[in-house]
A protein has these predicted regions:
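Glycine- and acidic-rich phosphate- and metal-coordinating loops
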Residues: 40-44, 62-63, 67-84
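DPxDG-like acidic metal-binding loop motif
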Residues: 1, 89-109
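C-terminal nucleotide
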Residues: 3-56, 64, 146-252
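Acidic, glycine-rich active-site loops and adjacent beta-strand->loop/helix elements
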Residues: 10, 20-22, 79-85, 103, ...
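Phosphate-handling active-site elements
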Residues: 67-76, 103-119
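Alpha/beta catalytic cores of group-transfer enzymes, especially the acyltransferase/condensing modules
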Residues: 110-157
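A short glycine/serine-rich beta->alpha loop
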Residues: 42-51, 81-89, 123-128
Length: 252
């Protein structure tokens, strides 16, 4: 569980600390590095990847909100968390959600679950990852007595109440290795996102669900960079902008 104690401010300062000694306190100003334009991905491309720091997950939410909303006030935020960091258990997404709640509550902006899900998923790209919004949707829509059914493209969510016979059942996730998003892990993470979001949808037919077993058998096990360039030459510039850690050499 991650808990955030949030205090609105009447100035543009953002001040955050953690109860864990591993994460040092920090402060930033709303007026520093204000996003320009109306295209989040284009601004991130100009900005480049920030130096790794836990503040990035909060400031990604702040900067994304600044691009699309009227943000005048900062906030104080103190974080307490039992989610093990660098474990693959979505501590980074939880922190981004806390940051999004903080900036939106402090500026009296909408905190509807769907708004929070979409905006925070994009905001986390500030850190260099290009993940989707499953973690964020799970955090916003989960219920204590239910399992959550999510679909994407189009997005839908449904909380399915557990039967009484399962009221005492506990679910646990086991992690076998660390997931610190350094350069190699981040590249592998973004590669999975790229394959799932860009490659597979371009390879399967429209009604693939009707014959998914045969469709799956026909998918290639791997594709080289050259095969991707040759197959979708008109998409390469977009790939390069969206996934710079994968395509750090120009396609030209």
């Amino acid at each position: 569980i991650m808990t955030a104690v949030i205090g609105p401010r009447d100035d543009g300062v953002i001040s955050c600390d953690s109860m864990s000694e591993e994460f040092e306190p920090w402060k930033q100003e709303l007026g520093e590095n204000i996003p320009s334009g109306e295209n989040w991905l284009a601004w991130l491309e100009l900005l480049g990847e920030p130096t790794p720091h836990w503040s990035n997950y909060v400031m990604g939410s702040v900067r994304h909100t600044q691009m699309f909303e009227d943000v005048r006030y900062g906030f104080n935020m103190s974080i307490t968390s039992s989610i093990p960091p660098d474990s693959g258990s979505s501590s980074s997404s939880a922190l981004a959600i806390c940051g999004m709640f903080a900036v939106r509550l402090s500026n009296q902006l909408d905190t509807d679950a769907e708004v929070m899900t979409y905006t925070t998923a994009e905001a986390e790209w500030f850190c260099g990852t290009r993940g989707g919004m499953m973690d964020h949707a799970t955090m916003m829509y989960s219920r204590d007595d239910s399992v959550l059914r999510l679909t994407f493209n189009p997005f839908s969510q449904q909380a399915i109440r557990l039967p009484k016979e399962m009221s005492d059942v506990k679910f646990a996730t086991l992690f076998t290795h660390p997931s610190k998003k350094g350069s190699e892990i981040k590249r592998a993470f973004n590669e999975l996102a790229f394959v799932a979001r860009e490659v597979v949808p371009r390879l399967v037919p429209k009604n693939w669900q009707d014959n998914w077993e045969n469709v799956a058998m026909e998918l290639p096990e791997k594709m080289s960079r050259e095969e991707i360039v040759n197959r979708w030459p008109n998409e390469c510039k977009m790939f390069e902008k969206m996934y710079p850690t994968l395509f750090d050499i120009n396609f030209e």
